C-alpha cells in the first residue's frame, strides 16, 4: 500500500485502459472513483472486484457531454471515496471521419468529451484542492498529436486541443496541481480492426510491440511519485511517433 487514503478519480474507468488504471491504483492503495456513463454495469462489477480484493472503489456516473453533470463530478467523487489527489481524464470516443465528411454532432461530442469535460473537471479539481494541498491531473491523449494524419479528423483535432490544454493547465494550476499526459499507441484492437490488422500495426512499430495494460497505471503512479514533472506527455506507444521509414526516405539517395 503506497498511498492509502489518497483517492483517484478515473473517467471512463470501467473499460479498456481506464479499467486497467482503476485496478492498478486500487492495488497500490488508492481509493478509486470509477466514472462511467453508459457502462454502469461494468463499473459496478469492477468496483465489486476491487472491494473483494481489499481495495476501495465506488462508481460515479456522469454524461461528459453535459456541463452541469461534468462540473459536479469531482465533488461527487469526494463524497463517494473521500479525499482525492489524482484525476485521470481517460474517457474518450474514437469515431472515424474526415474533413470532407465529418458530422457536426460527432465533432461536438469529441470536443465535449476530450476538451470541455477535462477542462471543467480540472476547474472543479482546482477549487477542491485550493492553495494548501497538492494534486495531479493526467490527461489521456494519443501519440498521433505528435505525428498527425488526416484520418479520424474530429478525434485527432480534439486530442491535439487536449495536448495544448495539458500544457496551459500545467501553467495555470502550478505550483499546487501538476498536469501531465499519456499518449498511447496500439494497445487494444478497436472495434473496426481485425486481429490481423492490429497485429500488423504492432509489427510496424519500431519496438515491434505496444504497451501492456499495466503500464498505464504504473505511469500514472510514476507521475504521482515524481513531483518535478508537469506539462509533459509520456508516449506509451512502442515508438510509434518516431516512425521514419517513409516513402520520401526509403530507397532514396539523399
Where are each of the predicted segments found?
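C-terminal substrate-recognition "lid" of short-chain dehydrogenase/reductases
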Residues: 213-236, 241-242
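Catalytic loop of short-chain dehydrogenase/reductase
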Residues: 130, 136-174, 186-187, 240
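Conserved glycine-rich Rossmann-like NAD(P)H-binding loop of the short-chain dehydrogenase/reductase
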Residues: 28-44
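Conserved Rossmann-fold SDR core element
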Residues: 25, 85, 163, 173-187, ...
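Conserved glycine-rich cofactor-binding loop
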Residues: 14-16
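Substrate-binding pocket helix/loop in short-chain dehydrogenase/reductase
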Residues: 98-99, 106-111, 201
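Active-site loop of short-chain dehydrogenase/reductase
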Residues: 5-7, 54-56, 83-84, 128-142, ...
Amino acid at each position: 500500500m503506497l498511498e492509502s487514503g489518497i483517492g483517484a478519480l478515473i473517467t471512463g474507468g470501467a473499460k479498456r485502459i481506464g479499467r486497467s488504471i482503476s485496478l492498478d491504483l486500487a492495488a497500490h492503495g488508492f481509493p478509486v472513483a470509477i466514472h462511467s456513463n453508459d457502462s454502469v454495469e461494468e463499473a459496478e462489477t469492477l468496483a465489486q472486484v476491487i472491494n473483494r480484493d481489499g481495495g476501495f472503489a465506488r462508481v460515479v456516473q456522469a454524461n461528459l457531454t453535459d456541463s452541469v453533470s461534468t462540473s459536479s463530478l469531482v465533488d461527487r467523487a469526494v463524497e463517494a471515496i473521500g479525499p482525492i489527489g489524482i484525476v485521470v481524464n481517460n474517457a474518450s470516443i474514437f469515431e472515424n471521419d474526415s474533413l470532407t465528411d465529418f458530422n457536426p454532432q460527432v465533432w461536438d461530442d469529441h470536443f465535449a468529451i476530450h476538451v470541455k469535460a477535462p477542462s471543467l473537471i480540472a476547474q472543479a479539481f482546482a477549487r477542491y484542492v485550493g492553495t494548501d494541498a497538492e494534486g495531479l491531473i493526467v490527461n489521456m491523449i494519443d501519440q498521433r498529436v505528435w505525428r498527425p494524419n488526416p484520418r479520424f479528423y474530429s478525434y485527432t483535432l480534439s486530442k491535439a486541443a487536449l495536448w495544448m490544454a495539458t500544457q496551459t493547465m500545467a501553467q495555470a494550476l502550478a505550483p499546487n496541481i501538476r498536469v501531465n499526459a499519456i499518449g498511447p499507441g496500439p494497445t487494444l484492437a478497436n472495434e473496426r480492426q481485425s486481429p490481423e490488422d492490429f497485429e500488423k500495426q504492432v509489427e510496424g512499430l519500431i519496438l515491434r510491440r505496444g504497451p501492456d495494460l499495466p503500464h498505464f497505471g504504473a505511469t500514472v503512479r510514476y507521475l504521482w511519485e515524481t513531483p518535478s514533472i508537469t506539462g509533459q506527455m509520456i508516449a506509451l506507444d512502442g515508438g510509434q511517433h518516431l516512425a521514419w521509414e517513409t516513402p520520401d526516405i526509403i530507397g532514396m539517395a539523399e
